[in-house]
Amino acid sequence: MRHPQPLPVNAFHWHCLRRDVSNFALLKHRHFDGFLITMQHSGTHWLKYMMSSALALQLELPSPRFVHNDSSNDFIGHPRHPRRYPDAPRLASTHSVPHALFDSRLLRLGLGLYLPPYVVLVRDLRAALVSNYEKWKERYGVSFKTYLRGDPRGRRYIFDIWGGMHFLNRWARVAQRFPAATFEVRYEDLQARPEVLLGRIFAHFDIAVAAQHIAAAVAAGSKASMADKLDPASPIRNIIRDDQRPPADWYDAEDREFFDAAVTRCLVDNHGYDWRWPVAGG
């Protein structure tokens, strides 16, 4: 009888604690009109490109030249980036998890610490892991099965199951404590209703954007349109994954058992996702 390998739960929680007490970035970078928080491989570039296109139309400013992140940074950049358009809303984006004090009611309400509204973009963790592996498999140099087990210390991979669960856990707590300031968007819902959710994102940031500009931005964000706006100088040439198998097909029975055990033990909120696996032929 095969015995599953013990989960490195203690190492995971220790790494989360170290990160949670040492990452002051979001407490430091507070003076923005809105902050886009995105789980890695959740459609960050796509959402930023659509938002940037809509803002450019609304404000009569140059649209992003290419779909790559650098072009969208003109409107939604790293918190440390200088502001390019003074008349545009000041927006920033990051993949970061917040400091342990970030969701302190005493700090926010008792001491009156200003924090901007946040939009948190998440994705089914199983699909995000496949996407990350597809992008970085040459660099990782391991099988998907090995990659899936990850590194709870956060050193081996750019993103893995442990980093994904840490992100989901921390932002679930923030959303639970401050629901009015935190708007969570699932990638799958954004795919199904991009115009509706793009409008809600701007509304959450209290930014007025005309409906026709949102519609035009969604059209610009189609795969065909984005494929025509790839930067010829960029090494990134693909908009979609090389392997078009459904993400669930990457996981064999042993992988599914490991994933189920990890999320059951370590994930505190499922973010509305159904972790059951599709039945073959069903």
Language-model features: locations:
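Substrate-binding/catalytic groove segments of enzymes
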Residues: I207-A211, V268-N270
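PAPS-dependent sulfotransferase catalytic core
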Residues: A216-R265
